[in-house]
């Protein structure tokens, strides 16, 4: 199959049940579009063979994803109908199914939209769980507080709105306006989904406009729904190739300027500060003509805004001379490194696209803050006598240059980093380091990605200080395919060096069941007299025993990241506490004057137990009923079905509150 535009490696052949042949043939076109592979059903050697052979050709990653998709389609391990707010239904049907294709590429699950608010998911266990998690993430983002995000002072509004609107330009359909009305948090997650697909060779190649993709992705065949097709950079239906459009660019530009001036001078609706933008009207498709259409007049009214006068012909804004505006402000260049510019790490910047409308002016205090900021900005750019609020188009253009957290994280990953642990002896007087891998990875990933590089940076830091006893705890399911994990090869290397330990987890009925990894960390710190590296406070574990409370209070080391720089405080316990070097060293134990007088191991353990009992009696006396019930529940979680033994130990040790000592006492019983 040579129609896919890339050199195909050795074809991958595998067998599936013959009963699923009809399903496979029905999904063949969609599978080839989503995963950008070629698929063929090989002829049967024997008509009675219960299996059929399928052949996939394409890039290795695409073939692996498509193979997992087909296996889940033919023999699904999990299948369920999930429900979500109907407002999100436009995601799965809008943009000609583009976001649904990106979700299928990311998870390799078979997705079928049903009635508004329901989605059928089927596939292998891992694919099903990933798809369910992505939908839950969209639902969670929909419930976020959106009032602050509508403020023009919010840092990411302009970039996210502009990129999302530009993404929909060549995919307009009946759901475009509903997509544009989604909260910015949901739009940002969809952009992240598209970016994830673009790192491979997934559905993001179906962009029909050359202005949204880098040159290396232009010229790729990209079929759309209902037979509509874009080939290369030529827009179907426009009748113009890029060369023709380039020759007529000057003429069209002059015509658009004249039309804009004529429209502004005609009897259009008065423009006032009370009016807000209608989302989705300002971004119309370029399929029909090749040039950006004019921005539609403003609709709707808000309360509490001062009216801005309009002057016929000259179109002046209050407080500014009529000559201060260009006749048409609808097309603004993209000056920042936006998310869509960097989708495929292209070397060339995209051409100009329409600038998004400004966000509606919020009530106090956002309005006053923006008004003060605009005065300061205009003081550097306009005449000294110019007062007032300034042009809303100019504010929208300036807001479009703001970066997003996802973009900043991707830029940080561009800097090369290699985990290099020198094979030299360490310092024996240093404490064991216990690293909260999930906490470190999420902090470095800006709470959005699981950054394996963050864990590697932390290990490198302590290794360079001379520590050799280092343990990183990470849930086992992070080793499986997870869209949020970045640079997982660092985890593989640390695991091969016995520096990383996996806490148990499993999947049951499509839900992930994980062990509480915080317990592993505190328990290991207790046994090794180690330091826990985490920004978590472990409040729920501090009440379980006095020893654990002392560990959490005295042996917890917080951290932070400045880009790719891992940093810890020089005074972990405050200004009056020990320095970092003293904090990381093992405590010095005083030895007796004669080694022959050292007690035996058995007598030492008995003395320690007796001291613990005496301490319990002196600290709190006999346990309260509530404490006993709590300890009984915790013990039964471990010693299931041994109610009589648990009750016996609790009655025999009325002063003990340490769950570990009670567990040891249970294990020592012989009946």
Curated annotation (Swiss-Prot):
CDD domains: KH-I_N4BP1_like_rpt1, KH-I_NYNRIN_like
Segments for region (Disordered): 234-274, 294-327, 344-402, 577-626
Keywords for this protein: Phosphoprotein
Polar residues: bias regions: 591-612
InterPro entries: KH_N4BP1_1st, KH_N4BP1_2nd, RNase_Zc3h12_NYN, UBA_N4BP1_C, ZC3H12/N4BP1_RNase_Reg
Biased composition (Basic and acidic residues): 250-272, 367-381
The keyword Phosphoprotein is assigned to this record: yes
Biased composition (Pro residues): 351-365
Domain RNase NYN: 430-582
Keyword Repeat found: no
Positions where Phosphoserine occurs in the chain: 355
Cystine residue pairs: none
Superkingdom, taxonomy of origin: Eukaryota
Family that this chain belongs to: Belongs to the N4BP1 family.
Protein name: Protein KHNYN
Annotated organism of origin: Mus musculus
Species classification: Eukaryota, Metazoa, Chordata, Craniata, Vertebrata
